[in-house]
């Protein structure tokens, strides 16, 4: 009995609140096997096909590439993208991508050469011989991302799980109407999917591995059971069909009975989830050595004549796939990427297929029905009953319309999975999911701006702190420089002063050069002394002539010369206090000539007259008296106010002096004759 209850608990499944049962519409496309689509002539590969930043380009325009060649480098959460076929890179430019607003993303545009040549592939058939880190790195570098719709990098997800994961869940529910990509993949490639699941289990080492699949896929269930017949490490759980049981939080609750907390992740409760398409891509990356260059896409809707599931190369234009399926557009044709509840309408058909593209729905006008007018909310609470996340959609609707971001956040709008169940049941035809998407985008923009402001504030505060530190260090340096020198500094200063005094004392002492030292000037000194002795002897031999020469006339001339020098000095002082007078060189020359003539005349007179005895003491006294008078006149000239000089008067005086000099010279010539 105990074993029976244990077995019952082992296969037990739970339920979640809310949910709806829309028409499935899956039989249009799940009855035909997977098929290949002819290569498009041109491929557009967006660099960003996942959650996170785009990778770094490693190709340029004009490069030839092979299928599987990396177009970008993957570092951190930057997932690389690879060439879907061989060809030539003709452009690297923005191009519209798979987005509700058809936003432009930087893309690599390749012209296919039709050869479809692969790069050299190196598979790891014995993946167990490699470490966990090596497997995760290979999965990341081969561009594997979540193919269920989220597009989160698989390698990053496996790395973040670490040792906390106790349950690995493989999501095979595929609950949205029309989509059968996973269903057909499980029917055609069940063995490869199970091998990929085992690689994931080898990396994570969980206690249990669960596959959750809805009961509306009988062929896929039978194929998986056949592959898992001898396997005891993987459990297949068939769950009731209910939308949105394929949501990550909803499927976790169905299979484990655990609820992911608000704002948390499934890894917080020891659960990690991967899609069956992701498991297949992991097998091809690790075992076959093939990067992800294609995926299964459902082509369905009444506007296509050949619905089914195809292997679509990444970067293939949507128009090319629909034309291969027999697309017959109407006047106002609508094409939806994704399902009717969570998908979005494409503005044009040149958008490329990316890693998260799982379905292209081309419905007819009668299939989708006429658009209905949006009406006011009647507070019926039907949306709250259908919400699988236990939210209050009608309150979130009012908060979103009123721009009440704080209240919307407090009511856990971030937990909305945008499944569209509330909009499906709304009797007023309110597009609630559109309001919620817009509100979440605005909240994210506000948070991003707040983050930038906080970072800018932190940078400013760090700069201010750095400036304060530099200022304090500067003041400390100035303060230390102003401190009195220490005792050892005083000793150094005293020694320097002593050296200076010693040098000064040496400079004042007479320099005595010993004979024989360098330079030796003794011979020159002796010659000079000999000349002086000869001059004295000669002077002693002619005392009469010397006394005659040094008679009264020369003494008188010396006195006059002293007086002239005093006058000249006085005039210089007056010139220093008065404005400078123009100097006449001719006048100075005339005056000098007159003085020489007078001196010559006096000498002649002295030669004709008998020489009077000269008293040297008397001559010295007279010269001293003359110098004293000259000095007194200089002092008086310095104390008296300077008279203004008249240049015309000076010129007249100079002319008179020249005339007198000529007359004196003529008179001297007459006297000599």
UniProtKB/Swiss-Prot annotation:
The keyword Translocase applies. Residues 534-553, 563-653 are annotated as: Disordered. GO terms for molecular function: 4 iron, 4 sulfur cluster binding; electron transfer activity; metal ion binding. GO terms for cellular component: plasma membrane. [4Fe-4S] cluster 2 binds at residues 387, 416, 419, 422. Its cofactor is [4Fe-4S] cluster. SUPFAM superfamilies: alpha-helical ferredoxin, Nqo1 FMN-binding domain-like. One of its GO terms (biological process) is electron transport chain. It is an enzyme of class 7 (translocase). The complex is composed of six subunits: RsxA, RsxB, RsxC, RsxD, RsxE and RsxG. Part of a membrane-bound complex that couples electron transfer with translocation of ions across the membrane. Required to maintain the reduced state of SoxR. This is Ion-translocating oxidoreductase complex subunit C. It comes from Salmonella gallinarum (strain 287/91 / NCTC 13346). The gene is rsxC.
């Amino acid at each position: 009995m105990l074993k029976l209850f244990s077995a019952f608990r082992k296969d037990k499944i739970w339920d979640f609140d809310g949910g709806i049962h829309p028409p499935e519409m899956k039989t249009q496309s799940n009855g035909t096997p997977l098929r290949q689509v002819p290569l498009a002539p041109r491929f557009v590969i967006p660099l960003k096909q996942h959650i996170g930043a785009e990778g770094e380009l490693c190709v340029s325009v004009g490069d030839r590439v092979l299928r599987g060649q990396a177009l970008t480098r993957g570092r951190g959460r930057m997932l690389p993208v690879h060439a879907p076929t061989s060809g030539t890179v003709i452009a690297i430019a923005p191009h519209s991508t798979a987005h509700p607003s058809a936003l432009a993303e930087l893309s690599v545009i390749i012209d296919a050469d039709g050869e479809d040549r692969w790069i050299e592939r190196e598979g790891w058939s014995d993946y167990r011989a490699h470490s966990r880190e090596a497997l995760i790195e290979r999965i990341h570098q081969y561009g594997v991302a979540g193919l269920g719709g989220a597009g989160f990098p698989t390698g990053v997800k496996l790395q973040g799980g670490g040792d906390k994961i106790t349950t690995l869940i493989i999501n095979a529910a595929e609950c949205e109407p029309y989509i059968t990509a996973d269903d057909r993949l499980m029917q055609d490639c069940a063995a490869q999917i199970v091998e990929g699941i085992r690689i994931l289990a080898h990396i994570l080492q969980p206690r249990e591995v669960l596959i959750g699949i809805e009961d509306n896929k009988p062929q896929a269930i039978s194929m998986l059971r056949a592959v898992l017949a001898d396997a005891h490490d993987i459990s297949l759980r068939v769950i009731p069909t209910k939308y949105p049981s394929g949501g990550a939080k909803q499927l976790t609750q169905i299979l484990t009975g655990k609820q992911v907390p608000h704002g948390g992740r499934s890894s917080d409760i020891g659960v990690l989830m991967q899609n069956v398409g992701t498991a297949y891509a992991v097998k091809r990356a690790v075992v076959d050595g093939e990067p992800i260059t294609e995926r299964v896409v459902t082509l369905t809707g009444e506007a296509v004549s050949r619905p089914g599931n195809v292997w679509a190369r990444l970067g293939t234009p949507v128009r090319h796939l629909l034309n291969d399926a027999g697309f017959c557009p109407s006047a106002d044709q609508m094409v939806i990427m994704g399902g009717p509840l969570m998908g979005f309408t494409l503005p044009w058909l040149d958008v490329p297929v990316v890693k998260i593209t799982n379905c292209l729905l081309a419905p007819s006008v009668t299939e989708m029905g006429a658009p209905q007018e949006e009406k006011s909310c009647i507070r019926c609470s039907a949306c709250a009953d259908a919400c699988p996340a236990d939210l209050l959609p009608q309150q979130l609707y009012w908060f979103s319309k009123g721009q009440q971001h704080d209240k919307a956040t407090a009511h856990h709008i971030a937990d909305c999975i945008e499944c569209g169940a509330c909009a499906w049941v709304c009797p007023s035809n309110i597009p609630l999911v559109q309001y919620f998407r817009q509100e979440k985008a605005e909240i994210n923009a506000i948070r991003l701006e707040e983050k930038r402001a906080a970072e800018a504030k932190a940078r400013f505060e760090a700069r201010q702190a750095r400036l304060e530190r530099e200022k304090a260090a500067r003041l400390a340096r100035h303060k230390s420089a102003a401190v009195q020198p220490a005792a050892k500094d005083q000793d150094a200063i005293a020694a320097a002063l002593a050296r200076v005094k010693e040098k000064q004392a040496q400079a004042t002492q007479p320099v005595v050069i010993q004979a024989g030292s360098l330079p030796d000037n003794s011979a020159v000194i002796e010659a000079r002394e000999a000349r002086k002795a000869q001059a004295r002897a000669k002077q002693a031999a002619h005392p009469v002539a010397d006394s005659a020469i040094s008679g009264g006339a020369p003494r008188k001339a010396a006195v006059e010369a002293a007086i002239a020098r005093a006058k000249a000095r006085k005039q210089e002082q007056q010139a220093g206090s008065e404005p400078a007078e123009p100097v006449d060189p001719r006048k100075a020359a005339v005056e000098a000539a007159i003085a020489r003539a007078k001196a010559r005349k006096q000498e002649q007179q002295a030669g004709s007259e008998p020489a009077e005895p000269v008293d040297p003491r008397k001559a010295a006294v007279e010269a001293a008296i003359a110098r004293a008078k000259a000095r007194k006149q200089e002092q008086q000239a310095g104390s008296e106010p300077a008279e203004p000089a008249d240049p015309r008067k000076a010129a007249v005086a100079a002319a008179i002096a020249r005339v007198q000099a000529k007359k004196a010279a003529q008179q001297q010539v007459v006297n000599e004759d």
